[in-house]
């Protein structure tokens, strides 16, 4: 049963929206399913707001503010079907007009802080299923200068020579659940970006699966260019960009929260040496990892021994499907969707719902050879950064169902 006290703020907000619209039209605003919105400011709302929104709908609003400005979106009211993972009825907010860089997903009555795009476009999408419904949502968008109170917003474009960024509610309260913030830092072409976290407290997890901060070289979320993924209460070591752009992504799930963080950046001349770290989580110390050498990669590419014989000498053992591969610096970097994990060790495992994956580095890019879309049994070592390390003598073979019984038996083996 929805609380009657929700109607008081709802009515006040509707009255405010009505008053604003009367400056242009004497009629009360009518909220429809999606639309194209341009200008300095305006309101969007679920279809029929403040009435109950219809079932089985998908509505998309595309917002554009003047060039050179960013979009700031403030939810004034939200009442959607509640679910811990927002699987049924939800509102998604995207950077730009495509389903690429999602800033956040929201449901229930949780009202997030201000959401900011990195450019002059933002997309809002609401999806409802066939069952429980609520009164929907109403939000106000406005145009702002890229740096206007930038450290108070959740994300945005940062292009001044120095500045700060912090989690919503910092330092007064814990950051809210269910938020994604994306800060895009852009320096002049001939400069680099140095990044430091002053205070840092994000929900701890061995693999940073729930709440985390990820830092990327460039201007987009791209796992191949990820510098690090961080959680816990130890500030990451200072980071220096490879070029003139960094992207910082903060994500909190819908459960535990923590104090949050504040970080600072400064531009510096490109001529200084850089010390960009390899991808890490705060659970593990920083490492440069193994590098391919002529001597190492001239070894015979041939596995030796058996499944049983290699089990105890391997840090991790898994069966999985290779889903992405990229060659960089003479090594192959692969993402493997895990079918089953038999020995985990310190391997960093990412989890999205029921799907688990791990990132592996084949130090010599073609030895052993991994092909995208194929299933393998993979045994290897784990670097200090949590990535699997596959050497020329690592034990890898095609995964077949008949191997399952033996692997299950090895899982209980005492080494």
From Swiss-Prot:
Signal peptide bounds: 1-23
Matches recorded under Pfam families: CUB, NTR
InterPro entries the record matches: CUB_dom, Netrin_domain, Netrin_module_non-TIMP, NTR_PCOLCE, Sperma_CUB_dom_sf, TIMP-like_OB-fold
Keyword Cytoplasm: no
Entry GO CC: extracellular region
TM regions (residue ranges): none
Residues listed as glycosylation sites in the UniProt record: 355
Disulfide cross-links: 33-59, 86-107, 154-181, 208-231, 297-364, 301-367, 312-415
Gene Ontology biological process terms, A to Z: cellular response to leukemia inhibitory factor
Keyword field contains Repeat: yes
GO terms, molecular function: collagen binding; heparin binding; peptidase activator activity
Reported tissue expression: Highly expressed in the heart, trabecular meshwork, pituitary gland, bladder, mammary gland, trachea and placenta and weakly expressed in the brain. Expressed in cartilage.
Superkingdom classification of source: Eukaryota
Post-translational modification comment from the UniProt entry: O-glycosylated; contains sialic acid.
Domain CUB: start-end pairs: 33-144, 154-268
Keywords, comma-separated and alphabetical: Disulfide bond, Glycoprotein, Heparin-binding, Repeat, Secreted, Signal
Location relative to the cell: Secreted
UniProt domain NTR: residue ranges: 297-415
Main location: secreted
Record function comment: Binds to the C-terminal propeptide of types I and II procollagens and may enhance the cleavage of that propeptide by BMP1.
Subunit record text: Interacts with heparin with high affinity, and type I or II collagen.
PANTHER family with a match to the protein in the record: OVOCHYMASE-RELATED (PTHR24251), PROCOLLAGEN C-ENDOPEPTIDASE ENHANCER 2 (PTHR24251:SF31)
Designated name of the protein: Procollagen C-endopeptidase enhancer 2
Protein source organism: Homo sapiens (Human)
């Amino acid at each position: 049963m929805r609380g009657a006290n929700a109607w008081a703020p709802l009515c006040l907000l509707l009255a405010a929206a009505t008053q604003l619209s009367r400056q242009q039209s004497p009629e009360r605003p009518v909220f429809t399913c999606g639309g194209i919105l341009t200008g300095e400011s305006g309101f969007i709302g679920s279809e029929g707001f403040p009435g109950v929104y219809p079932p089985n709908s998908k509505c998309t609003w595309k917002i554009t503010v003047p060039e050179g400005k960013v979009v700031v979106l403030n939810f004034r009211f939200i009442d959607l079907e509640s679910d811990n993972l927002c699987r049924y009825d939800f509102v998604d907010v995207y950077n730009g007009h495509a389903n690429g860089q999602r800033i956040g997903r929201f449901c229930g009555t949780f009202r997030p802080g201000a959401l900011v795009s990195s450019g002059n476009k933002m997309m809002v999408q609401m999806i409802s299923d066939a069952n429980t419904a609520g009164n929907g949502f109403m939000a106000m968008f406005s145009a702002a200068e890229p740096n206007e109170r930038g450290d108070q917003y959740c994300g945005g474009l940062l292009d001044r020579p120095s500045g700060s960024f912090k989690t919503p509610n910092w330092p007064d309260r814990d950051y809210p659940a269910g938020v994604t913030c994306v800060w895009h830092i852009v320096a002049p072409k001939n400069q680099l970006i140095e990044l430091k976290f002053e205070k840092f407290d994000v929900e701890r997890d061995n693999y940073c699966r729930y709440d985390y901060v990820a830092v990327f070289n460039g201007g987009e979320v791209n796992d191949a260019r990820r510098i690090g993924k961080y959680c816990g209460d130890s500030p990451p070591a200072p980071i220096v960009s490879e070029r003139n752009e960094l992207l910082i992504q903060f994500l909190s799930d819908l459960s535990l929260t923590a104090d949050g963080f504040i970080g600072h950046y400064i531009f510096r001349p490109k001529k200084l040496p850089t010390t960009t770290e390899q991808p890490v989580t705060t659970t593990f110390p920083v490492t440069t990892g193994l590098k391919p050498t002529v001597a190492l990669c001239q070894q015979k590419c041939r596995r030796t021994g058996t499944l049983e014989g290699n089990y105890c000498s391997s840090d991790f053992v898994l069966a999985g499907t290779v889903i992405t591969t990229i060659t960089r610096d003479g090594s192959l970097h692969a993402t493997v969707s895990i079918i089953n994990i038999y020995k985990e060790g310190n391997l960093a495992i990412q989890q999205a719902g029921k799907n688990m994956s791990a990132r592996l580095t084949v130090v010599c890019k073609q030895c052993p050879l991994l092909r995208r879309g194929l299933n393998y049994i993979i045994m290897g070592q784990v670097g200090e950064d949590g990535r699997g390390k596959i050497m020329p003598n690592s034990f890898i073979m095609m995964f077949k169902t008949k191997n399952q019984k033996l692997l299950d038996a090895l899982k209980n083996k005492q080494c």
